[in-house]
Amino acid sequence: VPVIAGITGEGTEVAALEAQRAVEAGASAGLLYPSHGWLRFGYQKGAPQDRYRVVYEESGLPLILFQYPDVTKATYNLETMLDISAQPGVFAMKNGVRNMRRWDTEIPVIRRERPDLQILSCHDEYLLHTAFDIDGFLVGYGNIAPELLLELLEAGKAQDYVKAKAVHDRLLPVTKAVYHRGSHMEGTVALKH
């Protein structure tokens, strides 16, 4: 089973060391989180691109671009996502922008410009909307209903809205109980209990 390590270290050099340890432990890939300081303060132009470049160059760990919600200051604009996804070692994107206007605008451009990039949705609360544009899900929901997620993914890839909607409707009570809450952290707690 491939292991995707979450690379969460604050600062680029610390993240590169964390990625090196992940390689030594047998990880197949790394999901590179933005520096947590960016959530509150934002980042300088070019800093995200530099983070991915340095972490890959120093570790050799294949990386997944992690697009944070656009309500944070750690979200990347389209240009930044295209820059990062063109870098050596970046093979996929976990997109959690949580703004369907941006999703509907940016995902087609990313598909056109980076056709080999795997696009993974992490929109647990927007599974139906994103299922038609992706290569897979990288979601906490996979711990709850993996079989139904696979059915939804297959329906989305087949562009079968009727089947996808039927799976979505089966998942909706769980989605509401876990993900339709006041904050993401409330959903995280609900997911664990």
Kindly label every feature range from the protein language model.
Residues A19, Y126, K192:
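Short glycine-/small-residue-rich flexible loop motifs, especially phosphate/cofactor-binding loops
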Residues V54-E58, P69-S183:
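Catalytic alpha/beta core domains of metabolic enzymes, predominantly
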Residues V1-K73:
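Active-site beta->alpha loop and helix N-cap motifs at the rims of alpha/beta catalytic domains
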Residues R181-H193:
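Active-site pocket-lining/capping segments in soluble small-molecule metabolic enzymes
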